[in-house]
UniProtKB/Swiss-Prot annotation:
Name of the top EC class for this enzyme: oxidoreductase
CDD domains referenced in this protein's UniProt entry, alphabetically: Histidinol_dh
GO MF entry, a single one: histidinol dehydrogenase activity
Reaction catalysed by this enzyme: L-histidinol + 2 NAD(+) + H2O = L-histidine + 2 NADH + 3 H(+)
General function of this protein: Catalyzes the sequential NAD-dependent oxidations of L-histidinol to L-histidinaldehyde and then to L-histidine.
PROSITE patterns in the record: HISOL_DEHYDROGENASE
Protein name: Histidinol dehydrogenase
Keyword match Zinc: yes
Gene that produces this protein: hisD
Cystine pairings recorded for this chain: none
One Pfam family hit: Histidinol_dh
Metal-binding found in the keyword field: yes
Amino acid sequence: MNVSAVADLSPEARAALFERDAGIEDARESVRDIIGRVREEGDVALRSYAKEFDDVDIGTLAVTDEAERAYDDLDDDLRDAIETAAENIRTFHERQVPDDWREQFDGRELGRRYRPLERVGVYAPGGTAAYPSSVLMGVIPAVVAGVDHVAVATPPAEELPAATLAAAHVAGADAVYQVGGAQAIAALAYGTESVSAVQKVVGPGNRWVTAAKAEVRGDVEIDFLAGPSELLVVCDDTADPELIAADMVAQAEHDPNASVVCVSDDEATAEAVADACERQATARERTEAIESALENDASAVLCARSMSEAVLFAEEYAAEHLSIVAADEEALLDRIDSAGSVFLGGFSPVAVGDYASGTNHVLPTGGLAKVAGGLSVDHFVRSTTVQKLDEDALSSLRETVTTLARAEGLEAHAESVDKRFD
């Protein structure tokens, strides 16, 4: 990787870094066909797609009972790791549960109450690897929120990943289906003979999954449309370049289209990070994906003229993952508002948030962190406002309400208040 100056980036280079999207447009037409077929044919379509896309002949779509058996048969070390991660995730998300409240305001009793959704679907990607962590991240916040029925959909296989099934059991999923891709999103959104329809679908996936979420949005709620993984590192000369590179390579491992960027106000540190990335990318099982991610136009090692310039870059970038490794990291954090999840200091690798620190790894990408946060308990509850007024309280607002209503030409609104004083 070459080091470029932030100030010298061409408009084209800046666009490649900042104009990140989920890359779903070319998938939407085929996804619409899949969704339409699932809505028409139900389980028949799901089995057909399992054979076409996954080369699997599936009988029973629901594999909920297999989850507990997978947990019982799991290797002790992996079981312990899943349970530890689950406990940390649960503890963090329990802190997010909102409390109902009512208060008096000059005779007006106003409040807000929160109620969980009834039915939620969590997509857990599969394909080249099993992702039990995604099951934990999607299911646990829903369970903590009090959702009555949480279903997991994961791609079918001749032998389903035991870790994924076990994670569903540990997290508290009520149903597990061996259905993947856009067809899984369609099944969760609209239901089939075997798959119960839900109110909301959450979880990461490839561009076909993301395109399907975009298509069903409006009929059901979704969390957000997430693209390939992103990491932005802001560091100074106190950072260890080898550790910065290790985090960048780790995120590049996710996807050849991942975006990994480092911005340092120290040129020597930037050069060392670039060199370390190239060295660490080699001789790995996923070297090809890592090297593709490091070499794509959305990845870069940059040198800023000052830490203020680096901070401005970070705020505009609005990364999914933001790592800050600097002498004054807390002060720098105070100056950056837009990021999905922040990792402070040299002992906070992004991987710990991916798995077990307790924060959620389902995060906004493509700059969405400017307006949205990561998956949380908030995604699984709805709020209702409540008001109760006595006669004196309504009387004090009578003129205000009737004047505004008549100014808007809504006489019946005004009369609905006046009649209470006839």
